UniProtKB/Swiss-Prot annotation:
Ranges of compositional bias, category Basic and acidic residues: 49-61, 93-102
Cross-referenced Pfam families: Collagen, Lectin_C
Protein name from the UniProt record: Mannose-binding protein C
Region named Disordered: 43-111
Modified residues (4-hydroxyproline): 47, 73, 79, 82, 88
Domain notes from UniProt: The coiled-coil domain mediates trimerization.
Quaternary structure and interacting proteins, as annotated: Oligomeric complex of 3 or more homotrimers. Interacts with MASP1 and MASP2. Interacts with MEP1A and MEP1B and may inhibit their catalytic activity.
Amino acid sequence: MSLFPSLPLLLLSVVAASYSETVTCEDAQKTCPAVIACSSPGINGFPGKDGRDGTKGEKGEPGQGLRGLQGPPGKLGPPGNPGPSGSPGPKGQKGDPGKSPDCDSSLAASERKALQTEMARIKKWLTFSLGKQVGNKFFLTNGEIMTFEKVKALCVKFQASVATPRDAAENRAIRNLIKEEAFLGITDEKTEGQFVDLTGNRLTYTNWNEGEPNNAGSDEDCVLLLKNGQWNDIPCSSSHLAVCEFPI
C-alpha cells in the first residue's frame, strides 16, 4: 500500500484541529474587536475600595472553652429610697408572769434599813462636830465669811437655805453654833421696814436688839445675828458668817 494517498487526509485533520482552537478563543473573547487576536491574561490591577459594613449578624452560640473567673465586685451604688412600711405583724401571745423571789424584797428592805441607820449616824456626827439640830432642822456652818448674796448661793448649792429662826429654841441653837456674827435669812429689800423671810412670808418670831431695826445709812436691808442672840439690821453688801439650815 502506498503512503502518499493518506497524506492529504493527515493535513486535513491538522487544519481542522487548528480551526477548532481558533473558534474557541474567539468565542471566549466575543467582546473584543475582530482585529485583536486572543492573548495571555494581563497583570492584576490594584485592590478596589472597601465596601460598606454589612448588617449586624445574629448573636453567636457560646464558645466551647472554660468559663472565666468571676470579676471583683463593683462599687456600691447610691442608697435607694426607703421602702414602704410593712404590715404589722400578728400580736404575740401573753407571756408568763415574772418571778420575784422573796429574798429580793427582803434584801431591798434590809438595804434601806441599813442606809437609814447610816444616815442617822452621819447626822448625829455632824450635829456633834459641826452643827446644831432643833426639831426637824439642822443648822450648819462652814466657817466662811462672805456677803449675803454669796451666803444664799452657798446654801442653795447644798439644797439648803440661809438659817432663819422661827422660835427662841432655833435662835438659841444658831447662837450656840456660831463664834462670829452671822447672816439670817431675813430682809426688807422689797418693802422698807417690812422684814420677811426669803420666801416672802412675814415673820412670826423676832428678837431685835434695842433700837433696831433703825436702817442707819438707808441701806440696811439684811439681818445679822449678834453674839448675844439678838438681831440687828445691816447692809447686805457687808461680809459675815454663813449659816445654812437643812430640813431633816
